[in-house]
Amino acid sequence: MATSPQTDPQHDDRPLPQDFETALAELETLVAAMEDGSLPLEQSLAAYRRGVELTRVCQERLAQAEQQVKVLEDGLLRPLDPRALDDE
């Protein structure tokens, strides 16, 4: 049996990674575990839920990077305010 992606199959209390690369790596690990078919149903559902959360982290980081590129393309070399993304 593959190692469990979490100890509690119903809920994962681990904090979400805040950087894109770590979130993507964890997501890829979860997908591989689910694809090999060795996880019991409850662990598969928990892995799916965690995967959705990780996907959201990745999407948010990509949106932030895209916004920074747009700012740089406009010649405005200033840090991006992440709160500006919440308004969209």
Swiss-Prot record:
Any one annotated GO CC term: exodeoxyribonuclease VII complex
UniProtKB keywords: Cytoplasm, Exonuclease, Hydrolase, Nuclease
Reactions accelerated catalytically: Exonucleolytic cleavage in either 5'- to 3'- or 3'- to 5'-direction to yield nucleoside 5'-phosphates
E.C. designation(s): 3.1.11.6
Transferase listed as a keyword: no
UniProt-annotated location(s): Cytoplasm
Any GO BP: DNA catabolic process
SUPFAM superfamilies: XseB-like
Pfam families xrefs: Exonuc_VII_S (PF02609)
Any GO MF annotation of the entry: exodeoxyribonuclease VII activity
Function: Bidirectionally degrades single-stranded DNA into large acid-insoluble oligonucleotides, which are then degraded further into small acid-soluble oligonucleotides.
Assembly notes: Heterooligomer composed of large and small subunits.
Family: Belongs to the XseB family.
Name of the protein described by the UniProt record: Exodeoxyribonuclease 7 small subunit
Organism in which the protein naturally occurs: Bordetella petrii (strain ATCC BAA-461 / DSM 12804 / CCUG 43448)
